[in-house]
């Protein structure tokens, strides 16, 4: 039972990562859901995140693109689960280290850039839907690849997502 936490006022990186990780874990037959303190903006509805409704007791809590506990928010029962985070997957160099384990790459332009590598390491195929979710994270956190945080690796990952069937 795995619960994926996103940050409040969700952007494309946190919800894209949450949805992509959800799909990857479902491919491994895991019981999984996503929780966000705030509603998912309509522009990200295509991610089809399976939102947590209390249907299981989480054994593992994973945060994606959340640099500190203050970013979780307090709605939808978030505080109950954000008190103990097992793993944080993040790209913010200033990550506070609140999780038991933190997978951090401060040179990544988006958490999606890092999560792409994680999903590959899990042995899960990058489906067109996972590619759409991860590409959304890349595109939104880089200002459509205009921000200075955009690197050659960001473009390499974007190209691999397009090859996997991302709908650009």
Regions found by a protein language model. Name each.
Residues 37-38, 93, 120-121:
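A short, conserved beta-to-alpha structural element at the edge of catalytic cores
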Residues 1-9, 20-27, 96-168:
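A structured phosphate/pyrophosphate-recognition subdomain
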Residues 2-59:
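Anionic-ligand anchoring segments at beta-strand to alpha-helix junctions in alpha/beta enzyme folds, i.e.
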Residues 14-19, 73-75, 151:
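Conserved strand-to-helix beginnings and helix N-cap segments that scaffold or border functional pockets
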Residues 29-31, 76-77, 82, 121-125:
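Short, glycine- and charge-enriched coil/turn segments that flank and shape catalytic ligand pockets
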Residues 4, 34-36, 88-89, 126-128:
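General beta-strand structural signal in soluble alpha/beta enzymes
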Residues 45-101:
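Active-site cofactor/cluster-binding pocket
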């Amino acid at each position: 039972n795995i619960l994926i936490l996103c940050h409040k006022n969700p952007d494309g990186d946190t919800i894209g990562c949450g949805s992509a990780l959800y799909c990857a874990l479902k491919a491994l037959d895991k019981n999984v859901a996503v929780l966000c303190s705030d509603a998912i903006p309509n522009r990200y509805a295509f991610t089809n995140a399976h939102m947590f409704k209390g249907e299981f007791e989480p054994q593992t809590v994973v945060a994606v693109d959340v640099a500190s506990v203050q970013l979780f928010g307090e709605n939808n029962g978030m505080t109950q689960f954000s008190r103990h985070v097992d793993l944080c997957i993040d790209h913010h160099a200033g990550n506070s280290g609140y999780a038991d384990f933190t997978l951090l790459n401060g040179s990544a332009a988006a958490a999606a850039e890092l999560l792409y590598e994680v999903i590959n390491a899990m042995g899960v195929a990058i489906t067109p839907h996972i590619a759409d979710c991860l590409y959304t994270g890349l595109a939104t956190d880089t200002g459509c690849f205009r921000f200075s945080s955009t690197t050659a690796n960001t473009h390499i990952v974007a190209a691999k997502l397009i090859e996997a069937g991302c709908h650009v």
